[in-house]
């Protein structure tokens, strides 16, 4: 009986030893990780205000995951068709609040760098001056305005307002066009919340000194989903017309007017990525 008891103890000891060794052999998680993202560069000549053609490039950024900080940034930008300039900044000062890391830096021809990284969404954006000559705002192709104040006017003259609607624009710098998605919009006339309204063709994009104006003179067909009896339903009854959306990257402002089916929509908010 005693031999059996000690045999059982030996088995438990062996299991404990193996488990302990497994814990000791675990490689520690790296404190930093470097990521890359494709960016659209909005470029303006500082002195004259001349708007230059958009360019695309990658940004590299290093994150200290333990302290939730951006510690290094490598910028790339091509000015008006010239060769791409690469600048690495290591003297970065950053702080994080509510999942958003804001960071600043300068050096190697870059002045007044201000950026933000969203730990939840994985989005990054930077504004900076280059060589004292150019103002550059680099964003990812998808530009968001979340929790936007939205007013709707219906055909019978009634109105509704909401603060939780989100607008997304996907900018194509080559064709200067953009798709649009509207999310969480209340249609009070039909007592339904539109989960998403996605345009099926692109609107035109004009590049301004501050950012972009997205507009369309023609009606854009959409695919719209909404919940009905607990299930998602799809409809085409919310085409977009009379669209004019102003995206002010310099001041982080968003304004838009459009006709969404029979609903006249006005939106005001912030650029949030």
Place the predicted regions along the sequence by residue.
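Bacterial Sec-dependent N-terminal signal peptides
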Residues: 2-10, 14-40, 129-148, 258-273
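Short, hydrophobic/aromatic-rich segments at coil-to-beta transitions
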Residues: 30-38, 68-73, 95-104, 142-149, ...
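Flexible, membrane-facing loop/turn or short amphipathic-helix motifs
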Residues: 41-52, 82, 132, 137-141, ...
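Polar/charged low-complexity regions in secreted precursors and cytosolic/nuclear IDRs
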Residues: 48-49, 56, 64, 80, ...
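N-terminal glycine/threonine-rich, aromatic-flanked beta-hairpin/loop signature
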Residues: 54-88, 160-198
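Contiguous, well-ordered beta-strand patches that form the walls/edges
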Residues: 76-114, 188-241
């Amino acid at each position: 009986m005693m031999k059996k008891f000690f045999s059982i103890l030996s088995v438990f000891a062996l299991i404990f030893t193996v488990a302990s060794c497994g814990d000791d052999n675990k490689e520690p998680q790296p404190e930093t990780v470097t990521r890359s993202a494709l960016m659209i560069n909005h470029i303006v000549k500082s002195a004259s205000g001349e708007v230059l053609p958009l360019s695309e490039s990658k940004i590299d950024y290093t994150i200290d995951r333990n302290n939730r900080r951006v510690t290094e940034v490598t910028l790339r930008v091509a000015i008006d068709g010239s060769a791409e300039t690469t600048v690495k900044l290591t003297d970065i000062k950053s702080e994080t609040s509510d999942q958003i890391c804001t960071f600043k830096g300068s050096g190697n021809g870059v002045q007044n760098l201000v950026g933000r990284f969203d730990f939840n969404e994985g989005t990054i954006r930077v504004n900076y001056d280059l060589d004292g000559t150019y103002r550059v705002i680099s964003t990812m192709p998808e530009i968001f305005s979340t929790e936007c104040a939205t007013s709707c006017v219906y055909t019978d003259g009634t109105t509704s307002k909401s603060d939780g609607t989100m607008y997304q624009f996907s900018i194509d710098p080559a064709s200067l066009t953009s798709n649009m998605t509207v999310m969480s919009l209340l249609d009070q006339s039909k007592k339904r919340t539109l989960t998403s309204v996605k345009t099926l063709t692109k609107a035109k994009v004009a590049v301004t000194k501050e950012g972009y104006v997205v507009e369309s003179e023609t009606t854009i067909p959409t695919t719209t989903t909404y919940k009905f009896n607990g299930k998602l339903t799809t409809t085409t009854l919310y085409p977009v017309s009379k669209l004019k959306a102003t995206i002010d990257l310099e001041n982080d402002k968003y304004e838009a007017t459009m006709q969404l089916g029979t609903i006249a929509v006005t939106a005001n908010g912030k650029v949030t990525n």
